[in-house]
Curated annotation (Swiss-Prot):
The lineage of its organism: Bacteria, Bacillati, Cyanobacteriota, Cyanophyceae, Synechococcales. This is Circadian clock oscillator protein KaiB. The keyword Nuclease does not apply. The KaiABC complex composition changes during the circadian cycle to control KaiC phosphorylation. Complexes KaiC(6), KaiA(2-4):KaiC(6), KaiB(6):KaiC(6) and KaiC(6):KaiB(6):KaiA(12) are among the most important forms, many form cooperatively. Undergoes a major conformational rearrangment; in the free state forms homotetramers as a dimer of dimers. When bound to the CI domain of KaiC switches to a monomeric thioredoxin-fold (KaiB(fs)). KaiB(fs) binds CikA, leading it to dephosphorylate phospho-RpaA. Pfam families: KaiB. The keyword Metal-binding does not apply. InterPro entries: Circ_KaiB, KaiB-like, KaiB_domain, Thioredoxin-like_sf. The gene is kaiB. Keywords: Biological rhythms. Has 2 forms, fold switches to a thioredoxin-like fold (KaiB(fs)) when bound to KaiC. It comes from the Bacteria. SMART domains: KaiB. Belongs to the KaiB family. It comes from Parasynechococcus marenigrum (strain WH8102). Key component of the KaiABC oscillator complex, which constitutes the main circadian regulator in cyanobacteria. Complex composition changes during the circadian cycle to control KaiC phosphorylation. KaiA stimulates KaiC autophosphorylation, while KaiB sequesters KaiA, leading to KaiC autodephosphorylation. Phospho-Ser-431 KaiC accumulation triggers binding of KaiB to form the KaiB(6):KaiC(6) complex, leading to changes in output regulators CikA and SasA. KaiB switches to a thioredoxin-like fold (KaiB(fs)) when bound to KaiC. GO terms for biological process: circadian rhythm.
Amino acid sequence: MSPRKTYILKLYVAGNTPNSMRALKTLRNILETEFRGVYALKVIDVLKNPQLAEEDKILATPTLSKILPPPVRRIIGDLSDRERVLIGLDLLYDELADNAFSSG
């Protein structure tokens, strides 16, 4: 069985708004359930760090970016749909493919 990949993610939020807090809570729940111990999440408040948002060309919040493993993927807006988040970031496909190959 191959070692699991490490996932590097960035979540861009705009302050402590209910929408930002909900996105963070939902994302942490997904990550702790599906990727415990194999992820790093950096939360960036674009109101406090506008230069980071500008450098990464973030135009709306919340935005979730998967940096590693490549390719970079982004989801903009509502993160409450677990399956949409996993598919949008190519995480669900990776995990299903790994399980299919390791079970045979």
